[in-house]
Structure formats: structure tokens, C-alpha cells
């Protein structure tokens, strides 16, 4: 077996744009609604009850679509927000693996943190485009963390918003 390509967060950041992601997410939602995507609910395991472990969880999210299979593993450890930011340990971390549907061969392993942040906001951008009343000029963002920031980025180019106030307490990211 040939080792799959590893794609770092920096490499993802260099190529993944909302201009490409939002239409792809829109199509994926259409395909899911049409039954073309096999995606069971995510499995979540709690990681915070054993001594020495910070409260958090670990989730696995498999999917099959077209010629590919994929799985995202993600962790959420809210206590990491209290750690020294210089350590670079985030509250959410993820890995995305892409596999061939015909052979099962691993094709790529990607850092999934940025992918997750952008994908979540892109889903909201698709919903906002479908549901936003004509002529709306303001959209409230509930929260002030990483997701609020990414939602503003995703919605900024797709709406004619003049104001996007955030509602929530600011915490260091």
C-alpha cells in the first residue's frame, strides 16, 4: 500500500475558499436530500470521566458519496481554551481521511480543523442565502468565538449585509 498524501492545515488554507466551498456544500446538501449520500449520525464518545483526562469528547463521522468514502474524526476539549495560547492547542481538532470507494485505498489524510470551521459556516451561508428576506441589510451572529468569526467570513461575500453584530462574550481564541 502506498501511504496516502498528507495535507496540512497550511496547505488547506492555501487552496480552500468559500467561493468554491459554498457551491460544493449546496450540492452536497441537495445530494443528501436526494438519498445519494450515505451518512449515518456521528458517533460520540465522552473522554472526560477518567482521571487525568480533561473533559471532552471524541467523534467519528463516516460518509460515502460518489466514488469516495471519507471519515472525519474530531475532538472537543473546552478546557484547552484555558491553556497558554502559545502552545497552539485548540479546543477543536480534527482529521479527515479520503478513501477510494472501489478499493478502500486511503487517498489523503487532511488536517480537518480549518475544514470543519469553514464547512460549518458554509452550511449556514447556504441556508442564509435560501432564507434571507430580500433587502435585508443586517444579520445577527450569536456568539463571539471561532465559529462566529468564520460565519462572518462565509456570509460576507454572499450577502449584502451592512451590519453583522455579534452577541456573546469575547474569549481569547
PLM regions: where:
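N-terminal Rossmann-fold NAD(P) dinucleotide-binding loop
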Residues: 148-149
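NAD(P)-binding Rossmann-fold cofactor-contacting core
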Residues: 158-173
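N-terminal ligand-binding/catalytic initiation module
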Residues: 1-117, 123-125, 132-135
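Gly/Ala-rich phosphate-binding loop of Rossmann-like dinucleotide-binding domains
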Residues: 152, 156-157
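Short, intrinsically disordered/low-complexity patches at protein termini
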Residues: 130-132, 173
Amino acid at each position: 500500500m502506498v501511504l496516502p498524501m498528507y495535507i496540512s492545515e497550511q496547505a488547506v488554507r492555501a487552496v480552500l475558499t468559500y467561493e468554491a466551498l459554498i457551491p460544493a456544500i449546496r450540492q452536497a446538501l441537495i445530494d443528501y436530500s436526494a438519498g445519494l449520500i450515505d451518512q449515518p449520525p456521528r458517533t460520540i464518545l465522552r473522554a472526560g470521566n477518567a482521571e487525568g483526562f480533561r473533559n471532552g469528547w471524541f467523534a467519528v463521522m463516516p460518509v460515502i458519496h460518489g466514488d469516495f468514502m471519507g471519515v472525519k474524526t474530531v475532538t472537543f476539549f473546552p478546557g484547552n481554551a484555558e491553556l497558554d495560547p502559545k502552545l497552539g492547542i485548540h479546543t477543536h481538532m480534527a482529521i479527515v481521511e479520503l478513501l477510494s470507494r472501489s478499493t478502500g485505498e486511503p487517498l489523503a489524510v487532511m488536517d480537518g480543523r480549518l475544514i470543519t470551521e469553514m464547512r460549518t459556516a458554509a452550511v449556514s451561508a447556504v441556508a442564509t442565502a435560501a432564507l434571507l428576506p430580500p433587502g435585508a441589510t443586517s444579520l445577527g451572529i450569536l456568539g463571539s468565538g471561532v465559529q462566529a468569526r468564520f460565519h462572518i467570513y462565509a456570509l460576507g461575500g454572499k450577502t449584502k449585509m451592512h451590519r453583522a453584530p455579534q452577541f456573546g462574550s469575547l474569549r481569547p481564541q
